[in-house]
Amino acid sequence: MKANQKKREPLFHIVKRDSLPWQKSWLIRIGAIVAALILCALLTMIITHENPISVYATMIEGAFGTQRRMWNLLQSLAMLLCVSLAVTPAFKMRFWNIGGEGQVLIGGLATAACMYLLGGKMPNALLIIVMIVASILAGAIWAVIPAFFKAKFCTNETLFTLMMNYVAIQIVSYFVMLWENPKGSSKIGIINQSTHAGWMPTIGTNEYLLNILIVLALTILMFVYLKYSKHGYEISVVGESENTARYIGLNVKKVIIRTMLLSGGICGIAGLLLVGSTNHTISTTIANNRGFTAIMVSWLAKFNPINMILTSFLLVFLEKGASEISTVFGLNQSFSDIITGIILFFIIGSEFFINYQLHFRHSHKEVK
């Protein structure tokens, strides 16, 4: 080859976009969802020979078919949103808190312990206050352990918080065995079923409305906290650059510990609502992987609590709809998971085209 031969250009270049208007961003996301639905429809016809329109109608039926289903969907949305709100300050600070699952479990365990040990020994109103304080403290303490080691010894918070999930599971498992009722069942059943001691109050006859209103209030407070408060500003600065934060005089270690106390405390509230208001029992699966799903919710919403309502709704809708597909059509659960996975893949992939554009060789055509 000649030394002066021109280098061959790559087929395309990936170039970071300037910030897109929100209308165009949402247009790209909607286009991704439509493309995913078309692909899922083709797969449905090829693999199952079912009418894809019937399958999609069944998904909607599974989520909204009855009033009970609608309230179940809103309850699931509220719980996922609550955990998502909890992990968001840490993620915005670039502290990779993978331990939301364990923090919810520990908050739930503290709630269950108060109900089990103090039920009937104090007025119910006082017991509920004790439960609230205990769950917030338990979640916050569990979260601040990895934060302390990160701030003091620069440990890897991803591995630390992930491993603490497994420790939390084993602690909950131990107390479930200790309190099991009846003996040998490996369950503790409904706590205080006859006295309802420690059960959170209901609004009218609706057992979910209180949870939904609490999480809605938390969403508004978190939005204001992150966007308008001094602490929210400090979280943003530390997330952008710890060196810059130190240069302008911020105590980075203090911000890390304070933010994780907040994250753990809100996870503790999620545990309180799950145990004291919804399930009235504790088990190792009560968090139902929300600690991990919340990470996706937070990232897709770009750490905006208001946008998280939409992303939480989408994920919960897909979960409820996919479950209904399996039941109605007698399909393997894996197929409904395939549909969910494809839709999520396209949604996550659309974020690439929101943040980047492709410049092709010769024509330099932009893919928008």
PLM regions with names:
Residues 1-33, 41, 240, 247-254, ...:
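Cytosolic-side transmembrane-helix boundaries in multi-pass membrane proteins
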Residues 39-61, 179-190:
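Interfacial/capping segments of alpha-helical transmembrane domains
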Residues 44-48, 54, 58, 63-118, ...:
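Single transmembrane alpha-helix segments in multi-pass membrane proteins
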Residues 49-54, 91-110, 151-160, 234, ...:
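Short, non-helical or kinked segments that cap or interrupt transmembrane helices
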Residues 77-88, 109, 140-144, 163-166, ...:
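Hydrophobic alpha-helical segments embedded in the membrane of multi-pass proteins
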Residues 157, 161-228, 366-367:
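Transmembrane helix-bundle core of multi-pass membrane transporters
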Residues 204-281, 305-306:
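Helix-loop-helix "hairpin" substructures at the membrane interface of multi-pass membrane proteins
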Residues 261-267, 273-341:
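Transmembrane alpha-helical segments in multi-pass inner-membrane proteins
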